[in-house]
Amino acid sequence: MKGTGIMDCAPKALLARALYDNCPDCSDELAFSRGDILTILEQHVPESEGWWKCLLHGRQGLAPANRLQILTEVAADRPCPPFLRGLEEAPASSEETYQVPTLPRPPTPGPVYEQMRSWAEGPQPPTAQVYEFPDPPTSARIICEKTLSFPKQAILTLPRPVRASLPTLPSQVYDVPTQHRGPVVLKEPEKQQLYDIPASPKKAGLHPPDSQASGQGVPLISVTTLRRGGYSTLPNPQKSEWIYDTPVSPGKASVRNTPLTSFAEESRPHALPSSSSTFYNPPSGRSRSLTPQLNNNVPMQKKLSLPEIPSYGFLVPRGTFPLDEDVSYKVPSSFLIPRVEQQNTKPNIYDIPKATSSVSQAGKELEKAKEVSENSAGHNSSWFSRRTTSPSPEPDRLSGSSSDSRASIVSSCSTTSTDDSSSSSSEESAKELSLDLDVAKETVMALQHKVVSSVAGLMLFVSRKWRFRDYLEANIDAIHRSTDHIEESVREFLDFARGVHGTACNLTDSNLQNRIRDQMQTISNSYRILLETKESLDNRNWPLEVLVTDSVQNSPDDLERFVMVARMLPEDIKRFASIVIANGRLLFKRNCEKEETVQLTPNAEFKCEKYIQPPQRETESHQKSTPSTKQREDEHSSELLKKNRANICGQNPGPLIPQPSSQQTPERKPRLSEHCRLYFGALFKAISAFHGSLSSSQPAEIITQSKLVIMVGQKLVDTLCMETQERDVRNEILRGSSHLCSLLKDVALATKNAVLTYPSPAALGHLQAEAEKLEQHTRQFRGTLG
């Protein structure tokens, strides 16, 4: 009555295997991976030809039909899954279990099948069990059972007898119940066995005991057939019949949850499936991580004090720990496979309890993880906090009993792949900048000007004769100070560049990220060479005898290398700054809220020092760069400090509330310091002398006067940027300073062209025009300042 047995099952449902991965393009489309088993709900979807409505892991959606393959029945006499059959049967008593007999026998009276609607309907009572059907990465399926009210639980992987003689077919275990798996499985009383295995494995058949009864047509399976399918003998428990992973009443929990290994004292040792078994045959792609281990004997003397998941039928990977006496759970083999992010497969999204081999080992790992977290939390900087890695290969498999902790582990598992790939960047990219757009632009421009001016200060000493003894002996100290300024300015700019790179890592524009990273790497390499050469010179205390060279060197020394790299830095810095300014809206957020009031702190003296500090630093730099005027500037700076402190602190020590920009008078101009006034006057004098040298048309004099104009102009720009504090005024000064720098560069290029093409009237005329443009802009710039 095979046909009748099939018809007795639930209504027919189609299953399909996914042939390819599918990434959904909309919310109605179903996502699945290759090898997933989908339940086809509807093949003719209105207005969606070529799409099927399918169900996977409790999610419904449309799936492309050309990516699915409908699964057909392999054998007509496949047993009907018992837990599907239970949906149609009457309620059962608390003393029944399921059994698959081996020989057709007339049925004996016994309890009916227990009702199994609890796993498919509504909320469960406190004593019910919730079933979840995971889709592990391997081809084997397991039924994970989560107990809500009592701790005993079991995860069983059951071999299919009718598949034992088909070793070439893919291995299967019970998954979502379907109706076409075979004939009806009848109930059996307690104290019965599924398989009656003789004591000697040489017997040709399987003979069940007299007490066993069955009413279904299961074909007789010989031992040779089982061996061909990977079985030598099967367990012969002396307790109740074969235990299926199905719901039972609380009173039966102690019987059905008893692990198979607990019968070891009453039964003979049995063999586990070999590597050629059709019961568990992982794909070749993952076979490297699974090494079949045939544990032929089960320990006889083991007494379990805690519930244990039976180990029968699982091929554990290499290095799996043995069970101890204080076992709480045994992790299934599907969860001992290497982590999901290492296999490029979908993570297990089900809320499966995870555990380690023993309570003691779990306690040790928890203690280690706690120490690591405390150590990592002790660091003050959150930008460069590194991801801590646990010394155990299974650190994230520890989970608490609460559903919240397990949910957090599941959610973190689903995003581990992307997290690992995005966090593999260097430590430099971990730092981020949280700056306003305007502040970021001002910062990068100020740092750029600082690098350019420091490099220009060193280039003033570089000429054809700068390594001669007389010249180098007079300027060795100034050159040393210039190298210090260059190293400091480049270091500050590189720190800012790393912060910009860290901010760019949060963007989706990979092209912008690559541009910023490449340009930052160029600056970083230059800075590394500067450090190496400067440290080499500092370690030798800048020996004059070694640095003096009266002839051309065949290979550059440390000082020459420093100058060569520093000469190229302004262009690299400018390129990086242009990238940041052009993409500022992507990298930084615009601060739309402008502060209307600015209040001084109660410590007015601190504010006074803050406003006076930049001129003091600039004064010190000028004292170092111009030793001849050291005494005069020292006296001037001390007077300036006293005057400015008296003016600022004496005005109003209380809150300072500036008028809104709309109410301010247009005549208000930035107030210049005495240093800036002096530099403006010096620049006008240098430009006048430059015009005089152009009239005489002497190349040497033209070069000298041009260098003087450029040097004074750079010092003026540097002083203006350092002394300006107010944001609105600072932006205005930075714009004028940037234009002034571009004009100085044009003058330098025109001077070079005029000298190389001397005595070309056209080149001299072009140089004259550039000098006039510089003078005109300088006068306009000076007029905008107070």
UniProtKB/Swiss-Prot annotation:
Top-level taxon of origin: Eukaryota
Chief localization: cytoplasm
Domain SH3 span(s) in chain numbering: 11-73
Sequence ranges of Polar residues compositional bias: 273-295, 374-391
PROSITE patterns in the cross-refs: SH3 (PS50002)
Gene Ontology CC entries for this record: cytoplasm; cytoskeleton; focal adhesion
Disulfide feature: none
Subcellular localization, as worded in the UniProt entry: Cytoplasm, Cytoskeleton; Cell junction, Focal adhesion
Chain intervals for the UniProt region annotation (Disordered): 262-295, 361-429, 612-670
GO MF term list: protein tyrosine kinase binding
Family according to the record: Belongs to the CAS family.
Subunit details: Interacts (via SH3 domain) with PTK2/FAK1 (via C-terminus).
Protein name: Cas scaffolding protein family member 4
